[in-house]
Amino acid sequence: MNDSEFHRLADALWLTIEERLDSWDGDSDIDCEINGGVLTLSFENGSKIIINRQEPLHQVWLATKQGGYHFDLKGDEWVCDRSGETFWDLLEQAATQQAGEKVSFR
């Protein structure tokens, strides 16, 4: 994968997160902000989830209250380089915990 392909895929990931939060009808308010390639989800309790791209490594990084995760593209799925869990699974787990209610991005 070259840098432009990586950015296209990361942009698509950011857009999907935004669209799914816009259509989410939960009780909690989750704000989504993109600034300089960093996507920040802010929760009512003041906690945050930070998602950013690491261009030199062609990775997506996820920072949550539970810890930090690094994802490589495997086929059409972003997969954690340590646990093998998917980006969507770990994002949903973290968002659900930080929102205090089930959050789904699928």
Swiss-Prot record:
<comment type="function">
    <text>Involved in iron-sulfur (Fe-S) cluster assembly. May act as a regulator of Fe-S biogenesis.</text>
</comment>
<dbReference type="GO" id="GO:0008198">
    <property type="term" value="F:ferrous iron binding"/>
</dbReference>
<dbReference type="InterPro" id="IPR002908">
    <property type="entry name" value="Frataxin/CyaY"/>
</dbReference>
<dbReference type="Pfam" id="PF01491">
    <property type="entry name" value="Frataxin_Cyay"/>
</dbReference>
<dbReference type="GO" id="GO:0008199">
    <property type="term" value="F:ferric iron binding"/>
</dbReference>
<keyword id="KW-0408">Iron</keyword>
<protein>
    <recommendedName>
        <fullName>Iron-sulfur cluster assembly protein CyaY</fullName>
    </recommendedName>
</protein>
<dbReference type="GO" id="GO:0005829">
    <property type="term" value="C:cytosol"/>
</dbReference>
<dbReference type="InterPro" id="IPR036524">
    <property type="entry name" value="Frataxin/CyaY_sf"/>
</dbReference>
<dbReference type="InterPro" id="IPR020895">
    <property type="entry name" value="Frataxin_CS"/>
</dbReference>
<comment type="similarity">
    <text>Belongs to the frataxin family.</text>
</comment>
<keyword id="KW-0479">Metal-binding</keyword>
<dbReference type="InterPro" id="IPR047584">
    <property type="entry name" value="CyaY"/>
</dbReference>
<dbReference type="GO" id="GO:0016226">
    <property type="term" value="P:iron-sulfur cluster assembly"/>
</dbReference>
